[in-house]
Amino acid sequence: MKLRRDIMLFITLAVVAAVGGVFLLLNRPGAAVDVFLSEAKARAAAARPNPANAESFRATVCAVGPCVLVEAGGLAVLVGAGEGSAEGLLARGLMRADLDAVVLPDLMLDSVVGLPGLAKASLAAGRRAPLKVHGPPGIVPVIDGANLMLAGEAGVRLSVGTDKEDQGLEGLLVFDSGVVTVRAFGGQVAGEGRVYRVDFEGKSLIIAGCRAKAAQIVSAARGAQTAAGILAAGSSRLEDNQDSCIPVADALQAAGQARLGAILMSPLRPSVAIPGALQAWRDVVAGERVAGAVAGGPGSVIDLSSGKPAIRLAN
């Protein structure tokens, strides 16, 4: 019994000493400065540029609104410019001075509000040429308005990208590097969004925003051998009177018809920025029972670099 008491006393004293040591360490003069500097170094390390290599084909959700950075063949194309896009890219080390283009799924405010911030952040990263922005008909006044907001910022400009050839069922060719192509499907009718398809080395990524139609998703995937998708969706189950975004059931049904091998649902309405919304969304998506479909927030990645598309969800 005495031995047991001695052991318990020793353990108690050790715990008290450890707790006391931590308390003294955190409350010593200058401790707050050390903590701040340590956290600042961690933030700087996370924001350090981390571009994908030339063989990679990946897409990263960069904000709670429309913002997906696609990196393929050493090139980078941003789909959507929602609120917080620049901050999201910077925080993940994905802001690039050599961003090849921004392509807008639609011209609604939530898809374009981040354009001025992107222009300024890309300039700060070292960009010198105007940032090209592609989008549906009506994009010119949107870019003019964004440039007007940047009028006081020397050297910061956006320019309207010129789409290439309309290839009928194969979509509108928006961007072609000779290795990577970006095609748009739909978006010719007022209020309708574009669905984009990015192709690299026989693999395809379909990206659909809130204003997309199910038929556009199916059309965009036509002829693809290995395909995955990042699809926006809304849920009237989670938000009353939600009618501004393609219903999750419709988006997933289209993804099934398109035979997408992996499906990342993002951005979503209601927004995953709302506490508890992301887990609720994961339950909703799981309830649709579509193989390979998951809901993810900012930082989630879909990777097509290897043989089979893979999704990595952010913590």
Describe every region a protein language model picked out.
Residues 2-23, 211-300:
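Cap/insert and terminal regions of metallo-dependent hydrolase folds
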Residues 3-10, 17-95, 162-222, 298-315:
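Core dinuclear metal-dependent hydrolase active-site scaffold
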Residues 32-33, 136-167:
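Acidic/polar short surface loop at catalytic or gating sites that assists cofactor/ion binding
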Residues 78-82, 99-111, 134-136, 205-211, ...:
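Active-site neighborhood of phospho(di)ester-bond hydrolases with catalytic His/Asp-centered motifs
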Residues 78-79, 92, 107-112, 136, ...:
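Solvent-exposed, acidic/flexible segments
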Residues 83-134, 162, 222-230:
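Active-site metal-binding motif and surrounding structural segment of the metallo-beta-lactamase
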Residues 86, 96, 115, 119, ...:
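Extracytoplasmic/secreted envelope proteins and their assembly/folding machinery
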Residues 120-124, 148-151, 256-257:
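Sec-exported extracytoplasmic/periplasmic mature domains
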